């Protein structure tokens, strides 16, 4: 899968060729999350073909003001994001020319300006005291132009933590889509019922560590028992919520891809899935990533060398190093596996090395 991003947040221009499983390594604040956001942004409008109550775009890309998307707020530039394979392409352009313009696959994205958008599910951005939202009466024509649909997910527990935990402990908040976990987790209860293996796998691991057990109730609530006593949500480790969220996300993406015949057209981005996660869950995480990679593409940000080693032991992983160049822009370079092997360089070594030291181990820098 080829990805090209220009003038998006910290990214002036990068080009990448991603494998079925791609891991982004690099120092903090290098701009790795901006790569995941760009992929989510370019594929966001396909969601209008599948369900109504969509996740807010502004939360996915962490921007309510459209000018936040432009590198250094330079509105003379054009945000350009292209994601695709030989079978499909999503090419998004955002620019200002006598006002805001959005183009997707060379077709104009129909939107309207409002002082206050009446239907919040159509909201895109704000700018200049106005709100921009999709024009529902004209959007069906754009979907026809796109042809075969693409589905992408950006699962980041820390990004949506409050909504995720609230949905798990209090029950389903939003029912759509029924087969695929939302990034904000608001349909967790409905989706998790069709992924019973996740609950079993998590409980099997917990049984080895303690007498803690997870139960999914009929109303979609998650209840965690410690020595047969229901725990208060505030006493439950985030690690339990995180692994449930990530595994249900991956498993549901596999299910949804097969259900809708979307093989090769589904992307799951994982933002630091290992954060605050019990290391004992890593094998399950790798297992679910491997299974989804048979039908779609996985892009992972991680700072954990153990997870990277497990992935590389079991899967053909494409490794990219993400760093800040001399101009302060995000740049990327693919790590050369042969060079890493020759010099006995591990993932842990890379995380502690300076960019100039890592770049000599790369194929080429963008």
State each model region's role:
Residues 271-273:
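Walker B catalytic acidic pair
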Residues 1-45:
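Pre-Walker A-like glycine/lysine-rich segment at the N-terminus of P-loop NTPase domains
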Residues 17-18, 262-264, 293-295:
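Short loop/turn elements that form and flank the Walker-type P-loop nucleotide-binding site
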Residues 275-279:
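Conserved D-loop-proximal element of ABC-family nucleotide-binding domains
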Residues 267-269:
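Walker B motif beta-strand of ABC-family P-loop ATPases
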Residues 2-4, 44-265, 328-341, 347-366:
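Phosphate-coordinating catalytic segments in nucleotide- and nucleic-acid-processing enzymes
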Residues 73, 280-366:
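C-terminal lobe/lid and adjacent interdomain/linker elements of RecA-like ASCE P-loop ATPase modules
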Residues 39, 244-247, 289:
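Short amphipathic C-terminal alpha-helix that caps PH/PH-like domains
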